[in-house]
Amino acid sequence: MSSRSIMGFDYGTKSIGVAIGQELTGTAQPLRAIKANDGIPNWDDIDKLLKEWQPDLLVVGLPLNMDGTEQEITVRARKFGNRLHGRFGKQVEFKDERLTTTDARARLFERGGYRALEKGSVDGVSAQLILEAWMEEQYG
């Protein structure tokens, strides 16, 4: 196992959750969410995050249906990942993200009740869960 840093994204049409993680520890932490306008992020905000954290790899969550089929948002998330690669030249991996938002809400609620369930917090923790699940899958 290497010590690469990895940035995870929870794609959404209004907000994109972001987390940063380390392969060596297999852990991640949520960062601030990036606002999106109909799924289009402020690319300058993403550029700033990439320059600040210098990730070696990017992981984008794929919102699949429960039966594993794709939906419109899945196609848009894949397109977002492809654009990340095209704009910034970083390797992009995709990870099934079914139920991560539900898990993120439960985790935040346990910590702070309803007040902890701010949208940006949920998106960041969702990105954290996507990233940690990807690392677990890679290195078990």
Curated annotation (Swiss-Prot):
One of its GO terms (molecular function) is nuclease activity. It comes from Aeromonas hydrophila subsp. hydrophila (strain ATCC 7966 / DSM 30187 / BCRC 13018 / CCUG 14551 / JCM 1027 / KCTC 2358 / NCIMB 9240 / NCTC 8049). It holds the Pfam family RuvX. Keywords: Cytoplasm, Hydrolase, Nuclease, Ribosome biogenesis. This is Putative pre-16S rRNA nuclease. Its main location: cytoplasm. GO terms for biological process: rRNA 5'-end processing. Could be a nuclease involved in processing of the 5'-end of pre-16S rRNA. InterPro entries: RNaseH-like_sf (IPR012337), YqgF (IPR005227), YqgF/RNaseH-like_dom (IPR006641), YqgF/RNaseH-like_dom_sf (IPR037027). Signal peptide: none annotated. It comes from the Bacteria. GO terms for cellular component: cytosol.
